[in-house]
């Protein structure tokens, strides 16, 4: 007894290269953007190192604290006489440090928003401030007076006055409790060590005005950004040439950030793009486009919030949602009675094992209309049905099945222009696909064999055949050029 006819199973083809990588999926998971509008350019974004990772946004003459979970303003500090710069939250989340255009450096208590210190040792605008992550009572400031100062919070006194830059200092960062790196508009990166008499221990020339320097966690590498390029410097080798130069932006790069695992570098620029680099090979693995020139950027320590500030006052917040996986297993509590089904203090009735098992019979799937037509040897109707509503893979599967059962010529015969044109259009669309080309070439030859003498009888069919011919000629030309290229490569490698 023969087996009943089953459903037509789609053909399986070799998988094509997937243009969407796991890296793309991760960065595209930053969704649900929340856009806020400030009154002036957003010059600084800084995340707290403490959960829930609130962040400070510096814009105009105020610093606002945003909640990472609510993504709205929690506190506003507006006690500045002029434009504020570089709002920086201490690692314990209790204090805020910021400079302003008058040269004043202020420390605020975030719980009360009161001013704890107001320091005026700088004579020009202070564009960079940063608490030392290794000591709660130490912080730095960099100013347009070409100096970097290291302060003692408890006394409010300058511990070290680092001078050496020949132009504005616009960026500085801690490398350890005693070492820091700075960059300025003189195009130099300078490494300082406060333990020695002459604190400037090393300098490099970036070649353009530097907007940001970022030391890596290893302590042996510094990244600088100035103009449209990023340069990577090896401090151990001490060479004056960078180990790597990245030129993926069209305009000046204004901000850099690193993820918490120190495996990805993010850069933002005036071209409105954010680029993500894999630091193992320094290649761009993903990119994002924003509506305006980017001035500042921050990535939360848990890599769930990406915040970007722009020159037009737009603040964009993108969030990556993490689904919490809860264990379905009940924790087993040992002790007396646990072997008898008693968990904790709740008693349960012990049940014996069930020796009877019921196996449900798998339900057979119903045949689709084109399956029934194929089963009834109505080959032309089956082909028309999949051409009308089927996917390309299903149509190819039907054509291959018709070839196997010897029904292809029957399915293609006795067609008018209205039923033949959709098939020719399908051939034109997919004949260059390497997965389908072998089968579609056979179908094309069969159509020309059947209707070759009568092609001029219908304008619709003649136009469809002409377009199909153009596609075939294009593929032949590409193949010829590919063969020529192979020959050239063989000559070079011989």
From Swiss-Prot:
Keywords: Nucleus, Repeat, Ribonucleoprotein, Ribosome biogenesis, rRNA processing, Transcription, WD repeat. One of its GO terms (cellular component) is mitotic spindle. SUPFAM superfamilies: WD40 repeat-like. It holds the Pfam family WD40. Gene3D superfamilies: YVTN repeat-like/Quinoprotein amine dehydrogenase (2.130.10.10). Coiled coil: none annotated. Component of the ribosomal small subunit (SSU) processome. This is U3 small nucleolar RNA-associated protein 15. It comes from Schizosaccharomyces pombe (strain 972 / ATCC 24843) (Fission yeast).
């Amino acid at each position: 007894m023969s087996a009943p006819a089953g459903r037509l199973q789609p053909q399986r083809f070799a998988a094509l290269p997937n243009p969407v990588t796991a890296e793309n999926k991760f960065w595209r998971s930053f969704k649900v953007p929340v856009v806020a509008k400030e009154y002036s350019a957003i010059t600084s974004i800084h995340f707290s190192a403490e959960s829930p990772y609130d962040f400070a946004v510096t814009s105009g003459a105020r610093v606002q604290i945003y909640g990472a979970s609510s993504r709205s303003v929690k506190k506003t500090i507006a006690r500045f006489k002029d434009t504020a710069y570089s709002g920086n939250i201490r690692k314990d989340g209790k204090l805020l440090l910021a400079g302003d255009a008058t040269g004043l450096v202020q420390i605020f208590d975030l719980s009360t928003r009161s001013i704890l210190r107001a320091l005026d040792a700088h004579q020009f605008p202070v564009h960079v401030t940063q608490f030392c992550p290794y000591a709660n009572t130490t912080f730095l400031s960099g100013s347009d007076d070409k100096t970097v100062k290291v302060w003692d919070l408890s006394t409010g006194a300058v511990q070290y006055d680092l001078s050496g830059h020949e132009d504005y200092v616009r960026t500085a960062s801690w490398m350890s409790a005693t070492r820091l790196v700075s960059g300025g508009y003189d195009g130099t990166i300078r490494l300082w060590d406060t333990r020695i008499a002459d604190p400037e221990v090393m300098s490099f020339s970036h070649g353009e005005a530097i907007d940001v320097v970022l030391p890596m966690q290893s302590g042996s590498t510094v990244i600088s950004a100035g103009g449209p390029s990023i340069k990577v410097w090896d401090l151990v080798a001490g060479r004056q040439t960078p180990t790597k130069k990245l030129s993926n932006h069209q305009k000046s790069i204004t901000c850099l950030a690193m993820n918490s695992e120190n495996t990805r570098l993010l850069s933002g620029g005036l071209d409105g793009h954010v680029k993500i680099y894999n630091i193992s090979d320094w290649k761009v693995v993903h990119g994002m486009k924003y509506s305006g020139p980017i001035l500042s950027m921050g990535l939360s320590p848990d890599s769930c919030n990406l915040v970007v500030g722009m020159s037009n006052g737009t603040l964009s917040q993108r969030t990556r949602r993490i689904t919490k996986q809860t264990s379905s297993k009940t924790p087993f509590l040992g002790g007396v009675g646990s072997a008898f089904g008693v968990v904790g203090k709740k008693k349960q009735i012990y049940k014996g094992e069930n020796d009877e098992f019921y196996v449900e019979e798998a339900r057979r799937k119903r045949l689709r209309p084109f399956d029934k037509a194929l089963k009834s040897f109505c080959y032309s109707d089956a082909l028309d049905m999949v051409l009308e509503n089927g996917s390309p893979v299903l149509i190819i599967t039907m054509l291959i099945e018709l070839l196997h059962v010897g029904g292809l010529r029957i399915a293609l015969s006795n067609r008018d222009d209205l039923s033949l044109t959709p098939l020719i259009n399908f051939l034109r669309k997919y004949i260059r696909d390497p997965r389908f080309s072998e089968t579609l070439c056979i179908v094309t030859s069969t159509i020309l064999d059947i209707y070759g003498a009568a092609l001029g009888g219908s304008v619709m069919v003649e136009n469809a055949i002409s377009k199909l011919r153009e596609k075939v000629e294009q593929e032949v030309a590409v193949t010829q050029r590919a063969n020529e290229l192979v020959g050239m490569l063989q000559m070079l490698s011989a």
